[in-house]
From Swiss-Prot:
Residues 349-359, 403-414, 843-857 have a biased composition (Basic residues). Keywords: Cell membrane, Cytoplasm, Developmental protein, Membrane, Metal-binding, Nucleus, Wnt signaling pathway. Residues 584-613 are annotated as: Required for nuclear localization and inhibition of Wnt signaling. Belongs to the NKD family. Cell autonomous antagonist of the canonical Wnt signaling pathway. May activate a second Wnt signaling pathway that controls planar cell polarity. Required for neuroblast specification. Residues 68-166, 328-433, 456-479, 515-580, 619-662, 773-799, 835-899, 955-982 are annotated as: Disordered. This is Protein naked cuticle. It comes from Drosophila pseudoobscura pseudoobscura. GO terms for biological process: negative regulation of canonical Wnt signaling pathway; neuroblast fate specification; Wnt signaling pathway. One of its GO terms (cellular component) is nucleus. Residues 968-979 have a biased composition (Acidic residues).
Length: 1009
């Protein structure tokens, strides 16, 4: 379609009076690229993203191209600057001067030159108000009217429109016309300067397209605001895509409702107001006659007839148009017969456009939502256009507002469409301006304007064409226009398809961001508002972002909104990314649920650890699943795990009966599981280590858990990322750790006994009960902290201690830093400190006892290796019994944690601590549990505060640990080995809980497998 459009432009330019200005381009893109006017934007810049300078040039070419047409041949034949001056003068003065036939001839010549001039002038317009106004007037009235009367009428219309808009455009135009000669060169030079300058800067070009359908929805003045941005800094020439976007938008809004009789014609009055840089260039292109002729493209005569009809329709449409637009078009029409001529041009174009629409109508019927969006945009555009009508720039301001809004809505979707629509607006403006000439002239002028719009740069340098050339151009333009109509249909179809595909792509692309989708989905409204606000801020700044950017893509779900004002695609992407980041998975209920389900899945897989038999529970799906399925299953498991993990905790600890929130504290590991299950909402915090990792991300919003949140952070938005092998089921990950803990347990002679006594699986037993030996590990044992500690800061130091888990800890640290930020770090730290201090005191006592027992056991091991084994068995029994007695009331993991439970107790305490922050209700349980859980392990990896608390608690719990270690004293040496292994196990277990599936999987790879 683009190729056809380019070809059409070529034929129109080459075959038309501007053929010499047309550059023979192999491809549409090349032609657009190489066309002086359109080349810049078409190549590098998206069709929609056209530099305002080029866009202004195009717009000016659209409107001032009419001025060029208006300019007398003598003036038009003048140098581009002279022509521009003359055009301005002629626009202001000459179009009054020019005779009806002259404007056509002049229209072509002046169209060429004035395209150049207007290219320059748009900048000049921006630079000089008089030039701007004059240029505007030239574009609206001087343009295709080419005739003095038509120009006068056009000017009168413009003046009326300006008066209606409160802008003395014609007065300024008269002044500009007077100053046009001096200003012409000045504007030309200035405009050239501005043109280059504006190429550098982004200029806002807004098109207000008031589309009214004769009959039926003609009562619906549809205001389309198309804002084209040349964000590339290239000459923002309106591309076929722009026009297509505009046409398609119009078609989208009215095409569905407009039904053209089988062989009849339907007139759609499209009023295009092109306001470059807030300068009101009002070209009312009424009655884009949507003439449906058996031939796909109506003949120029038919088109001209339709143009005449469009002239009438334009009046009708003017009535139908929004007040400002209608007033403008009425002023345009009332000011001169040129108004009718303008309508005719619009009608002719609209006929052709409508045929494309009719061709596309079935497709357009597919875009009901788009038409609704169009309607919304049209309403907004109406408001904007009415405001613009009130603005000095008149319809230009109207175009600026409405177009900006509409284009923002449609820019992403309708970039192509808008480019095409922009061209069509130019053509429509040209038609409107040329309407005063003759239907043919209007048609030709419309085509010329279009041609000039695209080839304005090329044609700007081209000398004025003879009238014969213009006539040939007129004929060829008609043919080309028919081609263009056909191509426009294709463009519209393509634009519609592109928009549809863009929507689909948006939906798909949005769905591509799986990890952040939840956060985005949860925050999609926030993100949309955020995007819309910056986009609204950038409405006039940049509407270039691809359709994707326009429709907020959250959670990979396309939010079908009328395109919010589109920032540049990158800006929107950045905004979306930022918003997604701001609303990371943890913030999103979807990701939270997914993470919670993942954490619960890992927890249920951890149930292998938590279960007495260490066997996966029914609801645990250890099998790797797709992230979505895994998340869904995890979500299911969250509900089930929320109940089952508390059940496990309840089974394992009297504290298990805690409410899901209170359950999270009980067992370190289980409490994390309970956290995750108990805190499905706070799942971030309530989830076990992955839950904590998730909770970190989520609790960052909750800001409850400092260190375990680091773990929870994994469960949170990052939990998949946090885990070295996030895709590996948490079960496998946990199993990976379980073998590690089991290995530690096995390395600890009492590990199995503790495991059995704990009722935990070998991993959990090794971690928690085996944690007894881990508890034996002196509180300073950094491996415990290093391995499991979610503490982001301490874990860096501790991370060096355990190499195997260092990486995981680094992730934990990263998460934990977030956790510190996001969770109630102080709450968790304090709770975990209190709980862990108590538990650490117990641990320290136990650990001291255990250490003493280790030494004593070392002696005893020498003396009583059998006793050590017995004590190891007893230690699982006794510490487990102690921990069950002490910790099970708070949490089963604590109760089941013998001295090994301490190693995991810290981890559990961390998990609980993070869960505690997530679940302040659980602090008592966590209080009791961490006291034992922390006692279990010297790991001070909860948070920095929690780490300190753990250190204190480990010291405090040293007595208990020593007591338990006294029980384990016989196996003290082995438990010292277990201290390393069990400490590693507890650290591993804690670390696993912190990053449940991630670290479990990691450990699975390392140890389990």
């Amino acid at each position: 379609m683009a190729g056809n459009i380019v070809k059409w432009w070529k034929h129109k330019i080459l075959g038309g009076y501007k053929q010499f200005s047309v550059q023979e381009c192999t491809t549409d893109s090349e032609e657009l690229m190489y066309h002086q006017v359109r080349a810049s934007s078409s190549c590098s810049a998206p069709p929609d993203l056209l530099l305002v300078s080029e866009r202004d040039n195009n717009i000016q070419l659209r409107s001032p191209v009419v001025n060029i047409i208006t300019t007398p041949p003598g003036n038009a034949s003048g140098s581009a600057s002279n022509k521009q001056q003359q055009l301005q003068q002629q626009q202001g003065h000459q179009h009054h001067h020019q005779a009806m036939p002259m404007p056509h001839t002049h229209a072509s010549r002046h169209h060429h030159h004035q395209q150049q001039q207007q290219q320059q002038l748009p900048q000049d317009m921006s630079s000089s108000g008089s030039h701007t106004k004059h240029l505007r007037i030239s574009s609206s009235s001087g343009g295709k009217h080419g005739k003095y009367a038509n120009m006068q009428q056009q000017q009168q219309q413009q003046q009326t429109a300006a008066a209606a808009t409160g802008v003395d455009e014609d007065v300024v135009d008269a002044a500009a016309a007077a100053a046009a000669a001096p200003h012409g060169a000045h504007q030309q030079m200035h405009s050239r300067h501005l043109h280059h300058h504006k190429e550098e800067r982004i200029r806002l070009e807004e098109f207000t397209c008031d589309v009214s359908v004769e009959g039926g929805k003609s009562s619906q003045p549809l205001q389309f605001s198309f804002t084209f941005y040349d964000l590339d800094g290239h000459h923002g020439k309106i591309t076929k895509d722009d026009i297509v976007g505009i046409v398609y938008t119009i078609y989208e809004s009215i095409g569905k409702s407009v039904v053209v009789p089988h062989c009849g014609s339907k007139t759609i009055n499209v009023r295009l107001t092109v306001s470059p840089e807030g300068k009101s260039k009002s070209a009312q292109q009424p009655a884009m006659a949507m003439g449906v002729v058996p031939a796909s493209v109506p003949l120029p005569a038919a088109a001209l007839g339709n143009n005449n009809n469009s002239n009438n329709n334009n009046n009708n449409k003017l009535k139908k148009l929004p007040t400002g637009l209608a007033a403008m078009s009425k002023q345009m029409n009332g000011g001169n017969g040129g108004g009718g001529a303008l309508t005719t041009s619009a009608g002719t174009r609209r006929q052709h456009r409508y045929r494309p629409r009719k061709l596309i109508k079935s497709d357009d019927e597919d875009d009901d939502s788009n038409s609704e969006k169009e309607k919304e945009r049209e309403r907004e555009r109406e408001r904007e256009s009415h405001a613009a009508d009130q603005q000095p720039s008149g319809s230009g301001s109207k175009g600026a507002g409405s177009k900006s809004h509409h284009h923002h809505h449609h820019h992403g979707r309708y970039q192509k469409n808008q480019s095409g629509a922009k061209l069509e607006h130019q053509q429509q403006q040209q038609q409107q301006l040329c309407c005063a000439d003759t239907p043919d002239n209007t048609y030709e002028n419309m085509l010329n304007l279009k041609q000039d719009t695209q080839a304005a740069g090329n044609e700007a340098t081209v000398p004025d064409c003879p009238s014969s050339h213009r006539q040939l151009h007129h004929q060829r333009q008609q043919d080309i226009y028919m081609k263009q109509a056909t191509q426009r249909v294709k463009m519209l179809r393509r634009a519609r398809k592109q928009k549809y595909q863009d929507h689909c792509l948006e939906t798909r692309q949005r769905s591509l961001s799986v990890g952040n989708d939840s956060g985005n989905w949860q925050n999609r409204h926030l993100q949309q508002s955020l995007q819309q606000q910056p986009q609204a801020a950038h409405k006039s700044a940049s509407v270039s972002p691809p359709p994707l950017a326009g429709e907020l893509m959250l959670d990979g779900v396309q939010l079908r909104q009328p395109r919010p004002p589109h920032q540049s695609h990158h800006q929107q992407l950045q905004q979306q990314q930022q918003q997604r980041k701001s609303a990371e998975c943890w913030k999103s209920a979807l990701n939270r649920n997914d993470l919670i389900s993942i954490i619960r899945e890992s927890m249920e897989k951890n149930r292998l650890c938590f279960q007495l038999n260490g066997k996966p529970q029914a609801n645990v799906s250890p099998i790797r699943q797709p992230a979505a399925q895994q998340q869904q299953q995890q979500q299911r498991q969250r509900s089930s795990t929320g109940s089952k993990i508390p059940t496990l905790i309840a089974n394992h600890s009297p504290a298990a009966p805690q409410s899901p929130l209170s359950c999270s504290p009980p067992p370190c590991t289980l409490s994390l599981s309970l956290s995750s299950s108990n805190h499905p909402a706070a799942a971030t915090c309530s989830i076990p280590v992955p839950a904590q990792a998730q909770a970190q991300g989520q609790a960052q919003a909750q800001a409850q858990v400092p260190a375990p949140p680091a773990v929870i952070e994994v469960g949170g938005g990052h939990h998949q990322h946090d885990h070295p092998q996030p895709h590996i089921p948490i079960y496998h990950q946990q199993l990976a750790i379980n073998p590690a803990v089991l290995a530690a347990q096995h390395s600890h002679n009492s590990a199995h006994n503790k495991l059995n006594l704990c009722g935990y699986d070998s991993f959990l037993h090794a971690t928690i009960c085996g944690g007894g030996s881990a508890a034996h590990s002196p509180p300073p044992t950094p491996s415990n902290v290093a391995t499991v500690q979610p503490i982001p800061k301490k874990s860096h130091n501790q991370k060096s201690l355990l190499q195997g888990y260092q990486r995981l800890e680094q992730q934990q640290q990263q998460r934990s830093s977030k956790d510190y930020k996001n969770y109630g770090n102080l709450i968790y730290a304090k709770l975990s400190e209190q709980l862990q201090q108590k538990e650490r005191e117990q641990r320290r006592h136990r650990h001291k006892q255990q250490q003493q027992q280790h030494h004593h056991q070392q002696q005893q091991q020498q003396q009583q290796q059998q006793n050590q084994q017995q004590q190891q068995q007893q230690q699982p029994l006794k510490p487990k019994e102690e921990s069950l007695a002490e910790q099970r009331p708070p949490t089963s993991s604590s109760s089941s944690a013998g001295s090994k439970i301490f190693g995991d107790a810290l981890e559990c305490a961390h998990l609980l601590a993070s869960e505690e922050e997530d679940l302040p209700a659980s602090p008592p349980l966590t209080h009791s549990t961490p006291s034992k859980v922390v006692s279990t392990d010297t790991l001070i990896d909860l948070n920095d505060d929690v780490g300190e608390a753990v250190a204190e608690a480990v010291t405090e719990s040293g007595g208990k640990q020593q007591q338990q270690q006294a029980l384990e004293a016989d196996e003290g040496q082995e438990q010292e080995v277990e201290l390393d292994t069990s400490a590693s196990s507890s650290m591993i277990h804690r670390y696993v809980h912190e990053h449940i599936h991630h670290h479990y999987h990691h450990f699975k790879e390392q140890q389990d497998v």
